[in-house]
Structure formats: C-alpha cells, structure tokens
Amino acid sequence: MSQTESAAFLAGYPLKAHNTFGFDVRARFACRIEQEAQLMPAVRDPRAAGLPRLVLGGGSNVVLTGDFGGLVLLVALRGRRVVREDNDAWYVEAAGGEPWHEFVGWTLSQGMAGLENLALIPGTVGAAPIQNIGAYGLEMCERFASLRAVELTTGAVVELDAQACRFGYRDSFFKREGRDRFVITSVTFRLPKVWQPRAGYADLARELAANGHAGTPPTAQAIFDAVVAVRRAKLPDPLELGNAGSFFKNPVIGPAQFEALKLREPDVVSYVQADGRVKLAAGWLIDRCGWKGRAMGAAAVHERQALVLVNRGGASGAEVLALAKAIQRDVRERFGVELEPEPVCL
C-alpha cells in the first residue's frame, strides 16, 4: 500500500466482529486505518461531514446500544520496536492497533519484563492508555513513557507524556476532555532493567505456588503464565461468550463511609489505599446482592465472576445496559455505594 492510498469508505459496515460483546450493529460508514497518513483524509472526506466519529481498536471497552450513525475508524496500525535504551530501562514502542496480549508476550520474548501482570487483557495497545488498564497490582501508567496521537479536528500530530494524559484509576484525559478527539497511533513504554516481581494478589500467589514458586521469587514469565491461567479460569473468552471483561470499576470510598459499611457488612472485601480511602471489590458487592449467574433476557451476570456481564447470544447493547442499571440500583440501595461502568456506553 502506498503512503498516499486512502482507506476505503465502507457503507453499512457490520460491527459484530469489532466489539467483544458481539453486538450485531452496523456503522453508517467505516474506514480501516492501516497507516497514520490515512486518518485525516478519512475524517475530512465529504461523506463524513457533520457525522459523529467513533474510534475502535479491539472493541473491548465499548457497549454499542444500536447502529452507529457516523464514521467508525477501525485502527489497524501494526508494528513494535525498541526505540532506545539507557542504563536503567528499555523504551519500547508499539503501534496503536497491536493486540495488547501479543505485545506483552513479545516483550517477554525479547527479555524485557515489566508488563507481565497485564497479560490477557483484551483490546489493543492504543486503547490501553485510554482506560489506564490494570490488573494484579500493576497499572499501565507505571510503565508508560509517552504516546503519539493525531488530533482529529486539526490533523496535528502530538506527543503526550503521562502528565498530559492525566491518568487515574481506569481513567485518563482520553475518557473525558479528549474523548473522540484523538486517535492514539503508538505508545512507548519504559521497561526497567532492574525488575521486581509483583505477585501479592492471593489468586496469583496461589497459582504461582501451585507451579513451584512458593517461597521463591517468580520469573516474569512465571507471572505471565500464572496471570493467563487465573484469568482464563475466572473470565470467559469473548470469542465463546461475548463480554467486555470487568464491567464495573471497584468503587473507592472515604474512611468514615467504610467504617459505617463495615459495621453492617463485617466481611466486606476491601483494600486500603495510600491516601486513606478504601477500595471495595465491586464483584463482592454484586454477588452479595444476588446477581451472580442471573439474567435479564439474553444479557447475564457470569456465573463465576460477578464483575463480568455477558451476552449469552443475541443480546442487544440496550439489554446489557438495562442489566447494568439494575445492578447499580441494587448495590446503591443495599450498600450506599455507586458503581461506575468501565466501558463506554454509546
């Protein structure tokens, strides 16, 4: 493909294969973006004038409640490389369309540790900063160096550091002020040469112990393998049962509210944060409200993990959203706690 070849405009494009819930919806127009230079010609095409835009990578963090009446940009940018190194770290760049899990595995194959706790998280590299993905004691922002993005209004190419991205818990600038304004075309990570394992989570520690790592520091590959095993045991494969992983964020509340809650619910699962606030396990709250395994139509709560909502076949995004709202209502009424969805609902 030449540098100047435009991405094809695809009308009435089916999005079922482009969202991990498997919702059978369509886009008015879609363009598959394989080169950064294709972005602005697609956005500025007269057929897209005045239409809303949606950027999709793996579609693992979106609930499509109906057909999208605008232009969907399907990010298919690929490539990964070590851009530089110093005495302390490697700096590794990956294109926005690289599958996240494959990228994590590749870094380990190249002898670079640091992302192994984030194995098997669905989606693409370009989506990772938007959500500030995290799991098993590590957040992406801890390994983040910078990203490259195209601003869709002006066509400007920008380089943003962590401060500009304003990372928070499953949050960033791109979920708020920057939403739908940018396409992240590549991300650079800083992977430390002096690496320390993070294996404190109980499920992870048990899996490592079962694999012969009890009392001995695990390798990065051992952590990667253990994370994959734990996630596969707890979470359904989107190719077999449509889902977007954890549907709700773990809520964080103040110490006074937590003490009052603990009086009513002594066994509440909680984690004290550095600032004194307390993070609650959303899955535990949902399970206590009796939702694990329950369904509303073809939308259901997974029987093994209450934090995961699933499409059992033929569910619409609206049905999943209705289920989510019913869960939020019950958790609010019983615990006085608000659950916030992780995926973007459109």
From Swiss-Prot:
It catalyses: UDP-N-acetyl-alpha-D-muramate + NADP(+) = UDP-N-acetyl-3-O-(1-carboxyvinyl)-alpha-D-glucosamine + NADPH + H(+). Keywords: Cell cycle, Cell division, Cell shape, Cell wall biogenesis/degradation, Cytoplasm, FAD, Flavoprotein, NADP, Oxidoreductase, Peptidoglycan synthesis. Its EC number is 1.3.1.98. The active site is at 170, 246 (proton donor), 342. It is found in: Cytoplasm. One of its GO terms (biological process) is peptidoglycan biosynthetic process. Residues 22-194 form the FAD-binding PCMH-type domain. Its cofactor is FAD. Pfam families: FAD_binding_4 (PF01565), MurB_C (PF02873). GO terms for molecular function: FAD binding; UDP-N-acetylmuramate dehydrogenase activity. One of its GO terms (cellular component) is cytosol. Pathway: Cell wall biogenesis; peptidoglycan biosynthesis. The keyword Oxidoreductase applies. It comes from the Bacteria. InterPro entries: FAD-bd_PCMH, FAD-bd_PCMH-like_sf, FAD-bd_PCMH_sub1, FAD-bd_PCMH_sub2, MurB, MurB_C, MurB_C_sf, Oxid_FAD_bind_N. It is an enzyme of class 1 (oxidoreductase). Its main location: cytoplasm. Belongs to the MurB family. Cell wall formation. This is UDP-N-acetylenolpyruvoylglucosamine reductase. The gene is murB.
